[in-house]
Amino acid sequence: MASADETGQELRISLFTTLPKRYVVTSAPIAVPANLRRRGLSSLINSMLDLDPPKPFDFLIEHEYLRSSLLDHVLQSQKDGAEAIIKVEYTLAMPPPQPGPSMPHEDWVGGLASTSVNGQEWLATASYDHHGRLWLPKRTECERVLQGHTRPVLGVDFITTDHSESVDVATGGMDQAVRIWQHRETESRVLVGLGHRGTVQCVAAQPTGNIVASGSWDHEIFLWSCVPDADDLDSAPGNKRRKVDSLYNEVQLKAPLGHLHGSGSVVHDMAWASVDTLYSVGGDHAVRQWDVEAGKLKMTQVGAKTGHGVAVHQGNAEHLTVATADVDGAARLYDFRTAGGTSGTTVLRSFTGPAHAVAFNPTNAYQVAVCGDEAIVNLEMAYPIKIWDRRSTRMPLHNLRVPAAEVPRGTERVDSYRMLALTWTPSALFAGGASKRVHAFHTESVQ
């Protein structure tokens, strides 16, 4: 059998890319040494494009990243590379994310969310210490503590509003309450939603900021208006209006605006795709698509396992990818079409324990991160965060774990490998969990 180390042997390849025009080379077949690897191909692309400074490229053959020589890859794929023209896709390589300073908490971090206000990134966290928190990650400083829940807080999300200076947040937790925190220059208030009969596992804010959805262990999805009731605020009895602290000086109790019935078990996570379309996952092994305006279930895709996390990426008007983090340790990608149904399911095998959360890269439509538990004895082999390129399912792009220096003293070492929440901003991937910290992994834009 031929070896990639043999000299003189050549293969014919055809290069193509989905990158911008400035990175496009001819797709005409060319002959290259069979022992060429990623670095050699990258040098070839840089030479053809005359790039200065040069850029690192990555390469895919039939949806698998090239991690050996061209010939070895062809032989492993059981293809007759000597006779065929090999189609090679190239893309800009993603540098390994670099760990940054962490943000400490008093207890486990159960939820994470991110947003940008006037060009400044914000993080929101939900913690088992009964509090939510707002952070400026560039300074790793806690800007605000959201006090009011009486039990662990599990879900958190930012609310987009017309008030460009405001940072509004929704939280939910084991006290069965939903809290909407609104901060204005003239006044601040907390809207407290009551009605769930079980732990509120997750909250998700509508893109317009008018509605917050909450999912619970009572199998229900409730919808809450983010608009205060003027009549109640003007004439509410004492139990509906009370001081909470010097920042959020008004509380208003609210009943649900509506319900979405049809979940067969606990609702673990939700994500909005548009102002009227919501996706949910939970203990009933299904990804559910909801028509919020009509108040009904629109579509159900049966999954392989219980879903712990869900995220959506809107590629275009007719192409939506839904990613789930599942109890069997895998992330799954569902290709939803507006015409109905799904087109295939991609499985990304990630962990020996359960996967807990999933997030898309906001600057690269192909990349998705998933976090979870590694149920293995040798912790040196454990990487609780993985970054995948959804074009390649054999192995992740990057395996990440918390640096030893970022694990607090007194924390069980295994806890630093149990990540429960993720969020991805243009500058960094953030993860939190049993280590009682939010860990930052700074990413570099390659466009």
From Swiss-Prot:
Q: Which UniProt keywords apply?
A: Nucleus, Repeat, Ribosome biogenesis, rRNA processing, WD repeat
Query: Which residue intervals correspond to the WD repeats?
Result: 107-147, 148-191, 195-234, 262-300, 304-344, 350-398, 414-447
Write one Gene Ontology MF term: ribonucleoprotein complex binding
Q: Which domain of life is it from?
A: Eukaryota
Localization terms from the record: Nucleus, Nucleolus; Nucleus, Nucleoplasm
**Any GO BP:** maturation of 5.8S rRNA from tricistronic rRNA transcript (SSU-rRNA, 5.8S rRNA, LSU-rRNA)
Q: Which cysteines are joined by disulfide bonds?
A: none
Q: Does the keyword Repeat apply?
A: yes
One Pfam annotation reads NLE
Q: Which HAMAP family match?
A: WDR12
Q: What family is it from? A: Belongs to the WD repeat WDR12/YTM1 family.
Summary of the function given for this chain in its UniProt record: Required for maturation of ribosomal RNAs and formation of the large ribosomal subunit.
Protein name (database record): Ribosome biogenesis protein WDR12 homolog
